[in-house]
UniProtKB/Swiss-Prot annotation:
Residues 1-35, 82-87 are cytoplasmic. The keyword rRNA processing does not apply. It comes from Escherichia coli O81 (strain ED1a). The chain crosses the membrane at residues 36-56, 61-81, 88-108. The keyword Lipid metabolism applies. It comes from the Bacteria. This is Probable 4-amino-4-deoxy-L-arabinose-phosphoundecaprenol flippase subunit ArnE.
C-alpha cells in the first residue's frame, strides 16, 4: 500500500510541474489572467497533496530508499512533455532516463 502512495505522490508532483508549464503557455490576452491563476492553482493543489502523501511515505520507508524513487518524475515529465507539447527529446536524454529507471529497479529490489 505504501508503494502505491509513493507512486501517487510522484504522479501528483509531476502533475504540479505540468500545470506550471501549462500556466506559461499562450492564452488570449483577455483570458491570460484566468489561465495563469487556474493552472497555478491546480499546480499548488497537486504539489500540496503530493507533499501530504510524501509525508505518509516517509513514516514507513527509509528516506534513502524513498527519495530516489522520486527520480521517476524525470521519466513521467519527459513522457508528458513529448505527448502534450511535442517537445523534442535527444537520444542522450532517453539514455539518461534508461539509467534512471535502471537505478530505481536496483534500489527497489533491495527492499
Amino acid at each position: 500500500m505504501i508503494w502505491l502512495t509513493l507512486v501517487f505522490a510522484s504522479l501528483l508532483s509531476v502533475a504540479g510541474q505540468l500545470c506550471q508549464k501549462q500556466a506559461t503557455c499562450f492564452a488570449a490576452v483577455n483570458k491570460r489572467r484566468k489561465h495563469i491563476v487556474l493552472w497555478l492553482g491546480l499546480a499548488l493543489a497537486c504539489l500540496g497533496l503530493a507533499m501530504v502523501l510524501w509525508l505518509l511515505v516517509l513514516q514507513n520507508v527509509p528516506v534513502g530508499i524513498a527519495y530516489p524513487m522520486l527520480s521517476l518524475n524525470f521519466v513521467w515529465v519527459t513522457l508528458a512533455a513529448v505527448k502534450l507539447w511535442h517537445e523534442p527529446v535527444s537520444l542522450r536524454h532517453w539514455c539518461g532516463l534508461a539509467f534512471i529507471i535502471g537505478g530505481i529497479v536496483i534500489l527497489g529490489s533491495t527492499v
